[in-house]
A protein has these predicted regions:
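Walker A/P-loop-proximal flanking segment of P-loop NTPase domains
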Residues: 1-51, 56-67
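Short loop-to-helix capping motifs
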Residues: 22, 280-281
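Hydrophobic core positions within the conserved protein kinase catalytic domain
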Residues: 33, 158-162, 203-204
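P-loop NTPase nucleotide-binding core
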Residues: 42-45, 49-189
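Conserved phosphate/pyrophosphate-binding and hydrolysis machinery centered on Walker-type P-loop NTPases
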Residues: 19, 147, 151, 193, ...
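The catalytic "switch" region of P-loop NTPases
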Residues: 1-4, 10-15, 26, 64, ...
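Non-catalytic, well-ordered alpha-helical scaffold segments
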Residues: 55, 59, 87, 91, ...
């Protein structure tokens, strides 16, 4: 990528320089995003084993789209695996969206921890932006939230990107990282006895909207396959496999880049051996250079 990128979202990879290769995947997704204003981009599922680079790809896509400052706005949300109450999950989802949307509108990078803002900060920042739609959506959600109406709160939160698309005349890329966790760790009651195991099904209709297509990821292929078959029937998500391996040439470049970053000189021959032994997998390359072995 030769374009200037502002890293508005702190990437988990650490130093952005360590994002190596992935030219095919990034070209695919950037072309996909460029077609969103034509309303022909279909929602996708990035599927690959853990540590295969899905999060790095999604976060880099976010930062590229944020930097371009066009009418395609990125939204990135990671589903975590601790048990969560559905109301709290919905609150986190919509605050994360509004935080990132206001970050985009004000051209203000997010904090280094990528945390969503409090409602007070969202309201304060929006006073300068003066977006009445944000005020309206906040008030609607908080009314449901304070009354404990989890179904209405969830529906409102999940539908927020599409809602803003029609009112602010923009488009969104809705990225949900590790979406399969939504079937396992979210509960409707504080006692954690009623599981919201079909929660991804709440996106059943939203996933087909071309104004805010979704890009979801999952690390457990069998789990993801079952979820898609059960809750996104009819090919609503385009299966997009992500290999853990770079191309051979990208792997060689990654070896030299990590060697430079760790101040460890390598020759062409030693780089070739490392690239071959690690099967040009950037995770294993990074582990090798980060090890304590001499």
């Amino acid at each position: 990528m030769t374009e200037q990128i502002t890293y508005a979202l702190e990437e988990r990879i650490g130093n952005p320089y360590l994002f190596c290769g992935r030219e095919r995947e990034m070209n695919l997704l950037l072309n996909w995003a460029s077609l969103i204003p034509r309303k022909i981009s279909k929602s996708r599922a990035l599927v690959g084993r853990r540590k295969s680079g899905k999060t790095a790809i999604m976060q880099r896509l976010f930062n590229i789209l944020w930097s371009r400052n066009s009418n395609v706005v990125p939204f990135y949300f990671e589903v975590l695996d601790p048990n969560q109450l559905l109301l709290d999950f919905s609150d986190q989802y919509i605050r994360t969206f509004l935080t990132q949307y206001l970050s985009f509108l004000t051209r203000t990078p997010l904090d280094n921890d990528n945390e969503s803002w409090s409602w007070n900060k969202v309201e304060a920042v929006n006073r300068d932006v003066a977006n009445n739609n944000i005020t309206e959506k906040m008030n609607t959600f908080l009314e449901y939230f304070e009354k404990g109406q989890h179904h209405q709160a969830t529906t409102t939160a999940f539908g927020t990107p599409a809602w803003f698309s029609s009112r602010d005349k923009v488009f969104f890329v809705v990225m949900i990282d590790e979406i399969q966790y939504m079937t396992e760790y979210i509960y409707k009651d504080k006692q954690e006895t009623v599981q919201a195991h079909r929660l991804p099904g709440a996106f059943h209709g939203l996933v087909e909207l071309k104004v805010a297509p979704m890009l979801v990821s999952g690390s457990y292929i069998g789990w993801m396959t079952q979820m898609i078959q059960d809750m996104f029937v009819g090919g609503r998500l385009k299966w997009t496999p992500i290999s853990s391996q770079l191309t051979f040439a990208e792997g060689m470049a990654a070896v030299f880049r990590y060697a430079e970053y760790h101040n460890m000189p390598v020759t062409e021959r030693s780089a070739l051996i490392i690239n071959t032994l690690t099967q040009h997998d950037p995770f294993y390359i990074s582990m090798l250079f980060g090890s304590d072995c001499p």
